[in-house]
Structures are given as structure tokens and as C-alpha cells.
Amino acid sequence: MIGWLEALLRVGRKLAAKTVTVQYPEVKPQLPPRSRGRIVLTRDPDGQERCVACNLCAVACPVGCIDLSKAVAEDGRWYPEHFRINFARCIFCGYCEEACPTAAIQLTPDFELSEWRRDALVYDKKDLLIAGEGKVRGYRYWSVAGKAITGKDKGDAEHEAPPVDLKGLRP
């Protein structure tokens, strides 16, 4: 008898408690600031695409959903000739964003990616490329790439071995 009464009281307390279900289409959920959603390709402050087709994002992807091929522009700069992401396979882990040296590939909080057909979840470069800079503002990869930092020659840092003289190592 007491067990039955305890169960009835427990049900009564749960009925009086506030519900936690969010009515999704009408009420948008509050997402954490670092939530990982849709992947985008960004541009630098000059309006050029940041991606240099280094293929690091495709190598870092644990499920292999990124496919790209490199092309060379007239000025010698690499750019992706085609860039595809299969969102049907993507697990939104963020490894591609971490691997990108130019901050070109970024994950946004947008999570509404449902489609009726799976082939519609394969996004091309034109679908991924956005007009803005994304989360990383003012970063110009080409202004810093390949340039030596002044005062940072080999052997100048604290607790660093002096440079090796290769010609002095002859037998």
C-alpha cells in the first residue's frame, strides 16, 4: 500500500513540474557559442577566398567527407578548383577547422541541414563560400605566409641550439 502511494505522489510532483521540451520550429533553441554546425568557406578582408587547397582538412577528416582538387592561379597562388563536403557523412567534429592554416574553413552554429534526398547534402564550393570573413576577422594569410619574423633567426631563442654548419660536418 505504501509503495502505491509513493508512486502516486511521485507522478503528481512530475505533473506539476515545469516542462523542458522546447517547441522547436516556433521557439528557436539557445545554442552555446562554440556549437559546431554547418561548415562554410570564408574570404579574406580583400574579398579573395582564403582556401589555398593544401588538403589538410581532407586529411584531418576522420570520415573522409571532404573532397577537393588544387588549381594554380596566374599569380602562382593555389586555390581549390572544386571543393565538396558530404554532410550526410560529416560528424561535425571540427578537425577540418583546426587543421586549416588559413582559417578558410569554419563551423557555424547553423544546424538546419535537413533535405529530402541524400544527394542534396553534398555541398559544392558555390554552396559553401560565404561573402564575409566568418569568425576570424582581419586575417590575411598571404601577408604573413613565407616571411621570416624579424629577430627570430635560428639560435636566437632562449635555450635553443645554435644552427648546424652542414659544411663543417664532412668526414
UniProtKB/Swiss-Prot annotation:
One of its GO terms (cellular component) is plasma membrane. It holds the Pfam family Fer4_7. Binds 2 [4Fe-4S] clusters per subunit. Its EC number is 7.1.1.-. It is a peripheral membrane protein. Its cofactor is [4Fe-4S] cluster. Keywords: 4Fe-4S, Cell inner membrane, Cell membrane, Iron, Iron-sulfur, Membrane, Metal-binding, NAD, Quinone, Repeat, Translocase, Ubiquinone. It is found in: Cell inner membrane. It catalyses: a quinone + NADH + 5 H(+)(in) = a quinol + NAD(+) + 4 H(+)(out). Gene3D superfamilies: 3.30.70.3270. The keyword NAD applies. GO terms for molecular function: 4 iron, 4 sulfur cluster binding; iron ion binding; NADH:ubiquinone reductase (non-electrogenic) activity; quinone binding. It comes from the Bacteria. NDH-1 is composed of 14 different subunits. Subunits NuoA, H, J, K, L, M, N constitute the membrane sector of the complex. Belongs to the complex I 23 kDa subunit family. NDH-1 shuttles electrons from NADH, via FMN and iron-sulfur (Fe-S) centers, to quinones in the respiratory chain. The immediate electron acceptor for the enzyme in this species is believed to be ubiquinone. Couples the redox reaction to proton translocation (for every two electrons transferred, four hydrogen ions are translocated across the cytoplasmic membrane), and thus conserves the redox energy in a proton gradient. NCBIfam families: NuoI, PRK05888.1-1. This is NADH-quinone oxidoreductase subunit I 2. The lineage of its organism: Bacteria, Pseudomonadati, Pseudomonadota, Alphaproteobacteria, Hyphomicrobiales.
